[in-house]
């Protein structure tokens, strides 16, 4: 089957790889001159299935009000003048109760755990390089309340079969030795030993090269104007004067998916702006071993070979890609506070990107009401964590194979009235 994939970020390229491996003739279209040059370029670098959780959580509405008056707030909201933003925020607020949070986190962990398994298999099969580490992730708490709240997430982890350690502050240095110097600032941490890290852009570009060698065609420098539809199917992609035709089409445009699908399929995917710093390592024993997550500021610090990636925060501000100095100062403050000897912060590269976020935090993966239009978008801050699993899942569905995990509640149909998916007995389904 001829398949066109729109988007060459980590999700689009992973989709191309798995569809190619399933025997399809795949073409990837992107406006950029190469793969992973937008949202996948400089994300936080963590592959953290156990920490897969929606921003829509109990307590967030009240916290958001407090954050309005804080210099280093993890979440910022500025109205962009669109009805879509207001509708999206209202939908997000409706997902902030405990029941929705547990349901949304459960299916996010299910997909993320499966994705980590798919990445592991891909690594074993291809020996793909991306400065990866398998050292786990450590979530750091600065207050007793945060430490106590961890028990809520532990219930989901136990249901999904995810190993964990809840550590008091005196034990944090057992997994991240450099934290011994700052343990007095912390109340404890939640460590997930099976989590991984890696450079998402490096992974995506290497996978794109492998996919191209396997027969995938990449059409870079090719802006897409619109999808052409006729009745119940898509019959082409208009790119300037050219119409590119296929048997099936996959939307993986991230935050730009919503606009491209306007008038065809309604999806609640909104850009969530984030920032990162890439910092050269200064002192090896003062740098992280793997990934830490600062629960207070919602910032991750991830170790690559000779660099640290400090990333996080969320701004609901529309398609604004301006690099704001106060956000850089927040990232610098956190890394200096936790790893004062770790990196040459003054040499850091500052970056921003737009994560495609749904109001419930779960991506949209699966077929639409159009029989040949498929979606793989809306992964929010977890595109790197979920890319391989989403790509494999999409490939299975498009190829008519039964996926390894429950998938009905990942489709766009979940936003329809009266949608009741068959519930898996275990959050992670077929994971072993």
UniProtKB/Swiss-Prot annotation:
- Which class of enzymes does this protein belong to? oxidoreductase
- Annotated residues that bind FAD are located at 3-17
Which InterPro entries does this chain map to?
Answer: DadA, FAD-dep_OxRdtase, FAD/NAD-bd_sf
Q: What positions belong to coiled-coil segments?
A: none
Listed A to Z, the keywords are: FAD, Flavoprotein, Oxidoreductase
Task: Tell me its EC number(s), please.
Answer: 1.4.99.-
> Would you tell me the Gene Ontology cellular component terms?
cytoplasm; plasma membrane
User: What cofactor does this protein call for?
Assistant: FAD
Reactions it catalyzes: a D-alpha-amino acid + A + H2O = a 2-oxocarboxylate + AH2 + NH4(+)
Please name the GO terms that the record assigns under molecular function: D-amino-acid dehydrogenase activity
Q: In which pathway does it act?
A: Amino-acid degradation; D-alanine degradation; NH(3) and pyruvate from D-alanine: step 1/1
A biological-process GO annotation: D-alanine catabolic process
User: What functional role does this protein have?
Assistant: Oxidative deamination of D-amino acids.
**Family the UniProt entry places it in:** Belongs to the DadA oxidoreductase family.
Give the protein name, as stated in the record: D-amino acid dehydrogenase
């Amino acid at each position: 089957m001829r398949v066109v994939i729109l988007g060459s970020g980590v999700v689009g390229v992973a989709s191309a790889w798995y569809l190619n491996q399933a025997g399809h003739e795949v073409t990837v279209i992107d406006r950029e001159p190469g793969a992973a040059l937008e949202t996948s370029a400089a994300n936080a670098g963590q592959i953290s299935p156990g920490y897969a959780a929606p921003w829509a959580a109990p307590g967030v509405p009240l916290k958001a009000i407090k954050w309005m008056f804080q210099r280093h707030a993890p979440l910022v909201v500025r109205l962009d003048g669109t009805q879509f933003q207001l509708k999206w925020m209202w939908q997000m607020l409706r997902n902030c109760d405990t029941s929705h949070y547990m349901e949304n986190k459960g299916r996010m962990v299910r997909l993320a755990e499966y994705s980590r398994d798919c990445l592991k298999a891909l690594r074993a099969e291809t020996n793909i390089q991306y400065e990866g580490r398998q050292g786990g992730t450590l979530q750091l708490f600065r207050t007793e309340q945060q430490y106590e709240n961890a028990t809520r997430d532990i219930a989901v982890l136990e249901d999904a079969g995810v190993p964990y350690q809840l550590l008091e502050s005196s034990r944090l240095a057992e997994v991240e030795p450099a934290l011994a110097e700052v343990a007095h600032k912390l109340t404890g941490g939640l460590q997930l030993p099976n989590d991984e890290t890696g450079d998402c852009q490096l992974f995506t570009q290497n996978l794109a090269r492998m996919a191209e060698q396997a027969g995938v065609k990449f059409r870079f420098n090719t802006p897409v104007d619109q999808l052409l539809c006729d009745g119940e199917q898509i019959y082409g992609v208009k790119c300037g004067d050219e119409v590119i035709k296929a048997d099936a089409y996959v939307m993986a445009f991230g935050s730009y998916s919503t606009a491209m699908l306007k008038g065809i399929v309604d999806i609640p995917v909104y850009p969530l702006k984030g920032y990162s710093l890439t910092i050269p390592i200064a002192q090896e024993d003062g740098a992280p071993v793997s990934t830490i997550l600062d629960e207070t500021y919602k910032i991750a610090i991830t170790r690559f070979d000779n660099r640290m990636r400090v990333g996080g925060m969320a701004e609901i501000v529309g398609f604004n890609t301006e690099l704001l100095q106060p956000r850089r100062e927040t990232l610098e403050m956190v890394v200096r506070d936790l790893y004062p000897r770790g990196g040459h912060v003054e040499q850091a590269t500052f970056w921003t990107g737009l994560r495609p976020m749904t109001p419930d935090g779960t991506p949209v993966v699966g077929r639409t009401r159009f029989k040949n239009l498929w979606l793989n978008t809306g992964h929010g801050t977890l595109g790197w964590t979920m890319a391989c699993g989403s790509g494999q899942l999409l490939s299975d569905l498009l190829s008519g194979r039964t996926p390894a995990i429950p998938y009905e509640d990942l489709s766009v149909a979940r936003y329809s009235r009266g949608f009741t998916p068959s519930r898996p007995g275990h959050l992670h389904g077929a994971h072993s």
